[in-house]
């Protein structure tokens, strides 16, 4: 704890003892999902929201029982809106899209939102708003209003806020606000940006990788060791984003080596952490199908710029960058069909709460059994509804404080 009683902020590994984390408890934004929009909003099914909330509460309880401070994004957003007029202006500006709803309706909507209490505004910014819910009659001045159905969204919901890993992550003492690849998630970064800019808890926090538009998502970034970062490039993070992030962390002295790891561009492996996560300081759990083929380009900070080498096998490149003899892979020993099923259900997407202790979905029975057989303690949580958006415990968490290794 520091003098204010808060946990000092900063993260330099995947497995250092977890002290504080940001989660987002599923809310009304999930109730906006319908068979008509779930694909567009990146959910494979319509979750049972009450059960998803129960599962998420269990996740938060498991973390708290291990001494982790759990901060909820909706609370942080409400608190920031309460203390800062600038936060309100920022949130409203990001939510009111004149390109979609036109100038006339945009003015009406912004004027209404400026009068809303912080808690209600927080809910609108995350859960969205339909035309029927807009308590003003702009029909006489807005063609957009007249031509839309009442159930259409004047502000789109953000159901993927559940996955707090993607819109921000920490490298050392700095926070990085990302640029998300798909339009359904683009506004999530404005929520996290607002919280970090205006919530008192984050006063004085410095940022890295600012003012970049090339896509980078936190699920593609693994802090393999202090100074060593892996960045997946695939469906979400682009080569341009990975290079910009690498150069940024080099310039800020946050890393000496970055491994850029190409991954297959498909939904099942949308992020690097869907196929590989760290469970100990020298060990990973990895989807067996890619173990022998995953490669990496090695970028290093040099006196005269940045050197690029490779591609070479990922496990070799990682061990070399980390200064260890070998990066161990927990042998799940799964047959092809079981491995594919459990990878789809985020069996490799674990969250380490300390070295050798991870949170995982209980449904991935075989992967969890192999982890335990290798000496890893597995804290099981339910995920039948949470998994509808294709994300596991690591996806659903943004660590903001870990102990150094």
UniProtKB/Swiss-Prot annotation:
Catalytic activity field: L-arginine + H2O = L-citrulline + NH4(+)
Q: What parts of the sequence cross the membrane?
A: none
> Which pathway does the protein contribute to?
Amino-acid degradation; L-arginine degradation via ADI pathway; carbamoyl phosphate from L-arginine: step 1/2
| Family statement drawn from the similarity comment of this UniProt entry | Belongs to the arginine deiminase family.
Q: What is the originating organism of this protein?
A: Rhodococcus erythropolis (strain PR4 / NBRC 100887)
Q: Name one GO biological process term.
A: arginine catabolic process to ornithine
**Molecular function (GO) terms listed?**
arginine deiminase activity
EC no.? 3.5.3.6
The alphabetized UniProt keywords are:
Arginine metabolism, Cytoplasm, Hydrolase
What's this protein's name? Arginine deiminase
Return the InterPro entries for the record: Arg_deiminase
Cysteine disulfide links: none
Q: Where in the cell is it found?
A: Cytoplasm
Q: Which HAMAP family match?
A: Arg_deiminase
Task: Kindly report, in one word, the top-level EC class recorded for this enzyme.
Answer: hydrolase
* Active site annotation, chain numbering: 395 (amidino-cysteine intermediate)
Does this UniProt record's set of keywords contain Cytoplasm? Answer: yes
């Amino acid at each position: 704890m520091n003098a204010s009683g808060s946990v000092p902020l900063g993260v330099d590994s995947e497995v250092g003892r977890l002290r504080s984390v940001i989660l987002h408890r599923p809310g009304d934004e999930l109730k906006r999902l319908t068979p008509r929009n779930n694909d567009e909003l990146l959910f494979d099914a319509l979750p049972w929201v009450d059960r998803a909330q129960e599962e998420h509460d269990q996740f938060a309880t498991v973390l708290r029982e291990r001494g982790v401070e759990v901060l909820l994004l909706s609370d942080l957003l409400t608190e920031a809106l309460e203390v800062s007029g600038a936060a309100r202006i920022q949130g409203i500006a990001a939510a009111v899209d004149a390109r979609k709803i036109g100038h006339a309706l945009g003015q009406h909507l912004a004027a209404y939102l400026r009068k809303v209490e912080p808690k209600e505004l927080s809910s609108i910014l995350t859960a969205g708003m339909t035309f029927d819910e807009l308590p003003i009659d702009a029909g006489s001045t807005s063609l957009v209003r007249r031509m839309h159905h009442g159930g259409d969204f004047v502000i789109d919901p953000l159901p993927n806020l559940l996955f707090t890993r993607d819109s921000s992550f920490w490298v050392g003492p700095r926070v990085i606000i990302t640029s998300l690849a798909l339009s359904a998630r683009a506004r999530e970064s404005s929520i996290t940006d607002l919280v970090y800019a205006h919530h008192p808890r984050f006063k004085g926090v410095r940022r890295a990788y600012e003012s970049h538009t090339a896509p980078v998502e936190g699920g593609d970034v693994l802090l393999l060791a202090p100074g060593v970062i892996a960045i997946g490039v695939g469906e979400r993070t682009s080569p341009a984003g990975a290079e910009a992030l690498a150069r940024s962390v080099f310039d800020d002295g946050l890393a000496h080596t970055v491994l850029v790891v190409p991954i297959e561009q498909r939904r099942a492996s949308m992020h690097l952490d869907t196929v590989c996560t760290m469970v100990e300081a020298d060990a990973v759990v990895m989807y067996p199908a890619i173990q022998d083929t995953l490669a990496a380009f090695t970028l290093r900070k040099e006196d005269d710029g940045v050197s690029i080498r490779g591609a070479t096998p990922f496990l070799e490149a990682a061990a070399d960058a980390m200064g260890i003899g070998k990066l161990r892979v927990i042998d799940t020993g799964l047959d092809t069909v079981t491995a594919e099923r459990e990878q789809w259900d985020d069996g490799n997407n674990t969250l380490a709460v300390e070295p050798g202790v991870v949170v995982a979905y209980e449904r991935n029975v075989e992967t969890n059994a192999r982890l335990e057989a290798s000496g890893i303690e597995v804290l099981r949580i339910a995920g039948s509804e949470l998994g509808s958006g294709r994300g596991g415990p690591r996806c659903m968490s943004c660590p903001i404080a870990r102990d150094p290794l």
